[in-house]
């Protein structure tokens, strides 16, 4: 409980500082009713303040104060006057609220100034309804828990209403998620009834009265926080508004300590996964369609959708349960009918659509809303019910020329209370609707005309032009080279047959068959040589083949030399067999010839490869 002691000390110092702070004016709060709802991760505070002017001068502003640790986490604040009582009570339009000057006030408080609808004269009364939403004020305690432990959080507040005005009567009620409370600060007139904790009523409190309280209780709420959410709203005047939302969600509750057991979680999900959340609920507009839910892996089929005439609910279930500190990334998208959200007013069109996330009880640390308007939109303006950072960009899509204007709205610390409608006004000419269809028609027309011209026009090169004649000559050169290659390959194949006859001779000893093979080979090689002569002359007649002819001539010479060496080898082997020489003696006699044959064969192969590359 060391952390609790430090908190108590800080709250005590705050109370001491407040006692020395002067009152703002002669206003008196005759009755204060505060209600704090902590059933979700967001602490929602509702206050009913009955204000009386007990001074002699009129007052036009009213001050709201919060402890600094609450003011730093204030996400939403609205103040509105109310009239009537009970069922006839009605709340009027919200008043203007701004941060007040802290001059003369301690740093331990945050002050906001509310502009009253009209000056409050002496003796007049006014009832104000204040709604405030705070994030990060429900602190997990302990900060780390195991999978099987319950999730406990701690709330710090004041039993007495912190105000720069004297309070005649005030009460506080805290609505808890359930009746399981570990501990709470006890004062006079403190009562616990089920899941509701009540303090007061307390009478005749001085200005800046402060009595710190700490409530330690169980919370099963989903502490889902979107570290970043990008909502892209694309408007198409052809009948659709497409919404795409990219979420980066983290569980900001007590972090998981130890290992996660999927088996225990599946068998006993309630006691073994009480601190985790398994799904989120998104409440979409009633006529949403074409809904999808996916992540980086692909479509997630575990989502469920229910729809009726008033709403469409999408139950988002991540691929795994989220414990404290765990993150997930996903995208949801849906289409909306244009007629439900796009309207016309005073010569302008305006988009009327919600600002925040449709996911219930989601806290968004950074929200970026990108409204993509049709190409040609101009005179763009935005109306929002609260302050946001605005900028404009250009986005290029299919068939765009100048690009589509994009209105970018940014806001930090966003809660569901911010899910109010914004209006994006712009001017757009109906003629621009025809730009993309006309572009498509023009593209197909140009393609059609091009095809007609291509099929009917003679785009071949003139047969009398030098380039055409040079191409013809080069084609003839290439054809001649292919013939030379073919003849030389036939010669090499004939050489192989001659070598094969020698191998048969060594195996069978049939000299006559070997001589017959020699005679057939000799006749075939002579015929092939005759075919080569006119081809060489033909190549030499073309100037374009001047760099090739020497290689071809060298190829023919090498092949002729190879023929002679093979014939000499063949003669030597046959004579050896006729004289009945030994095999070793014959091999010794042809050894030098064989080396030359191998070298010539390799040179011929290299020349053929060179010609083939041409």
UniProtKB/Swiss-Prot annotation:
Subcellular location: Endoplasmic reticulum membrane
Highest taxon of the lineage: Eukaryota
Pathway(s) where this gene product acts: Protein modification; protein glycosylation
Membrane topology: Single-pass type I membrane protein
Entry's family note: Belongs to the OST1 family.
Subunit structure: Component of the oligosaccharyltransferase (OST) complex.
Purpose: Subunit of the oligosaccharyl transferase (OST) complex that catalyzes the initial transfer of a defined glycan (Glc(3)Man(9)GlcNAc(2) in eukaryotes) from the lipid carrier dolichol-pyrophosphate to an asparagine residue within an Asn-X-Ser/Thr consensus motif in nascent polypeptide chains, the first step in protein N-glycosylation. N-glycosylation occurs cotranslationally and the complex associates with the Sec61 complex at the channel-forming translocon complex that mediates protein translocation across the endoplasmic reticulum (ER). All subunits are required for a maximal enzyme activity.
Protein name: Dolichyl-diphosphooligosaccharide--protein glycosyltransferase subunit 1A
Lineage of the organism: Eukaryota, Viridiplantae, Streptophyta, Embryophyta, Tracheophyta
Gene giving rise to this polypeptide: OST1A
